[in-house]
Regions:
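Binding-site signature for planar aromatic cofactors or substrates
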Residues: 1-164
Length: 164
């Protein structure tokens, strides 16, 4: 999570294949590569005016959560950038975090929510992104079916592509 100079917060999920999300620069510094996503870059804008960040790391199947707090900066080139390449995608930026605090958070919330128990999941309880989009922009020329197809393809394609 980040916050702008007015204290307005933003939290944005990050993800890469197991073992490739975070690069350990040294004992007190980590780097997280920029990856194509929704292209909003809210968190990066926030870091430019307020370097304070809070990170939560969720590992599927584990109840505890690794939490890191620190000061971040954006870098566009560093010796470790080759280590950030995933599936041929060379990041144009990395978020470098100087760690000030690191600790594990207990598993009670995940245990109560049964987050890692697929048999408890109810994906149809919430409307889809396409349904929410159509409901909030009813004059959109796209049908719900077109939006469902678009979002399905958008999530699957271009995750690591070089095009933006």
């Amino acid at each position: 999570a980040t916050a702008d100079d007015q204290g307005r917060c933003d939290a944005s999920p990050k993800g890469d294949p197991p073992g490739q999300l975070v690069h350990i620069v040294d004992d007190t510094t980590i780097a997280i590569a920029e990856r194509p996503g929704n292209r909003r870059v809210d968190g990066y804008h926030n870091v430019l005016v307020n370097p304070r960040v809070g990170l939560n790391f969720f590992v599927p199947g584990r109840g505890d959560t690794l939490r890191i707090n620190g000061r971040a900066r954006l870098v566009s080139d560093a010796d470790f950038f080759e280590a950030l390449v995933v599936k041929g995608h060379h990041p144009i930026l990395a978020l470098v975090v100087e760690i000030e605090e690191v600790f594990y958070h207990c598993a009670k919330a995940f245990m109560r929510s049964q987050l890692w128990q697929p048999e408890t999941w109810q994906p149809d309880v919430l409307p889809s992104v396409a349904a929410i989009s159509k409901a909030t922009i009813p004059d959109s020329p796209e049908t719900l079916e077109q939006l469902e197809a678009y979002y399905g393809q958008a999530y699957e394609q271009g995750i690591y592509s070089e095009t933006r």
